Every structure is written in C-alpha cells, then in structure tokens.
Amino acid sequence: MKALWAVLVVTLLAGCRADVQPELEMQEPALWQSGQPWELALGRFWDYLRWVQTLSDQVQEELLNSQVTQELTVLMEDTMKEVKAYKNELEEELGPVAEDTKARLSKELQGAQARLRADMEEVRNRLAHYSEEMQVMLGQSPDELRARLGSHLRKLRKRLLRDAEDLQKRLAVYKAGAREGAERGVSAIRERLGSLVEQSRVRAALTGQPLRERAQAWGERLRGRLEEVGGRARDRLDEVREQMEEVRAKVEEQAEAFQARLKGWFEPMMEDMRRQWADLIEKVQLAVGASTPVPSEDH
C-alpha cells in the first residue's frame, strides 16, 4: 500500500513539473519584448543561448570551431551598445531633475549594466572553456562534459534572467524620472506663460483706461518711487550724521588726551624754570647786597 502511494506521489510531481517547466520557459522571453532596441537585442542573445543549450550536433560542431563564442560576442556587444544608447537618450530627458538624483540613478544603472555584461561574458567564457575541454577531453567522456556544461548554463541563464530584470526595472525608474523631469519643465513653462499672459492683460487694461486715470496711476508709481528714494536718502543722511558724531567724539577724545600729555610735559618744565628763576633772583639780590658800601660815620 505504501509503495502504491509512493508511485502516485511521484507520478503527480512529475506531471506538475512537466506542466510548469514549459510555461516558465515560454514566459522568460516576454520580459524584454516591449519593443525597445536593447530588449530586442537581449532577446536575440537569449534565443541563441537557448539553442546552444540544446547541445545538438550542430552546436557541438560550431563550439569546436569557435563560431558559437564569436556569435555570442557579437550579440553581447550589440546588446550593450543598445543599452548605452537608450541610457544616453534618457539622460538627455533628465535635464530638469536634480543633479544628486541624476547621479544616484546613473550610478545604479551603471551597476546593473556591469552585472549584465559580466553574466554574458561568463556564458561566453564557459562555452569557450567547454570547447577546449572537448578538444583535449582530459580523460572525461563527452556525456559527462555535456552534463556539466548543461548544469552551468542553467545556472548562468537564471542569473542572466535575474540581472536582465534588474536592469529593465532600473531603466524603467530612469525613464519615469525623465518623464517627471519633463513634466516639471512643462509646468514651469506653463507657469511662465501664465505670468506673461497676466502681465499682457494688465498692460491692455492700462492702455484702455482714460488718459487721466493712466496719469494718476503713473503719478502714484512715481510718488511711491520718490518716497522710497527719499526714505533711502534720509536713512543715508542719518547714517552720515551718526558717523560724523562718532568722528567728532573721537577727535575730542584724542584732543583731550593730547592736551593732557602736553600739560604733563610742560608743567614740570615751567615749575623747574620758576624755581631756577627764583634762585637766580635770590642770588642776584645777595650779590647786590654784598657789593653796596656801608655809609661812613665821619660824613
């Protein structure tokens, strides 16, 4: 009984695998069939890789003469050239977007490009290595080499599919940013045009007014302008007055300081001169007194 259940389970699982696997294989190419040149080029690379993975006799023959690796190289370069062209096209549309946002998106996109190129190069290099092993065999059977290559190719295809999806998503984000920047630029132009239309409407309204009203309007504008100029002049005059007061105060302060220094210099000098003069007078008086004769008593 247990053996019967085991057989039924194995049969169901095999049937499910048979139903799911072809569906996955059919869904994979639809990821890059939106019509962009780079997606079409990647689709050609993918289709050629699926054909190589069959390892038919023709594939074996072309692998041995390096035709497969040459064809993969051409398809890889075509794909990356189209990716670069599409990226440059989107960069031109990213003009109004902020520079930091543009730099961040560009860096992320370059990383996705590098990963996709590395995947395709690894596929090509793996097939070239298989071709070398087939030529020398190295004591291994062809079936063993084919089985190992098939396992490697399945892993590489999964990685290639994952990185292709990542690149596709990042390009979509890049395109959305370009569209947003373009819409923002159009909005700015629309606002500018609206402002110009409003100004034209005001000019037309002023032109249609009577001459007296227009003169009054211009008079009001001129009066406002004169008041503004007068206010600025008064402010400037006040500033000059304050500066003059500051200069006057500084000059007076410096004059007082200079006067104090002069007084400090001359007062000791005058005091010394007065003292010397007093000494001189005293000496003269003494000298005069000593030289005057005393009157004689005989006379």
Curated annotation (Swiss-Prot):
The stretches annotated as sequence repeats are 74-95, 96-117, 118-139, 140-161, 162-183, 184-205, 206-223, 224-245
Keyword vocabulary terms for this entry = Chylomicron, Endosome, Extracellular matrix, Glycoprotein, HDL, Heparin-binding, Lipid transport, Lipid-binding, Oxidation, Phosphoprotein, Repeat, Secreted, Signal, Transport, VLDL
Coiled-coil ranges from the UniProt annotation: none
Query: Which species does the entry assign this protein to?
Result: Heterocephalus glaber
Q: What is this protein called?
A: Apolipoprotein E
Q: Which GO terms describe its biological process?
A: acylglycerol homeostasis; cholesterol efflux; cholesterol metabolic process; lipoprotein metabolic process; melanosome organization; phospholipid efflux
- GO molecular function terms here? cholesterol transfer activity; heparin binding; phosphatidylcholine-sterol O-acyltransferase activator activity; phospholipid binding
Record gene name: APOE
- Region Lipid-binding and lipoprotein association, residue ranges: 204-273
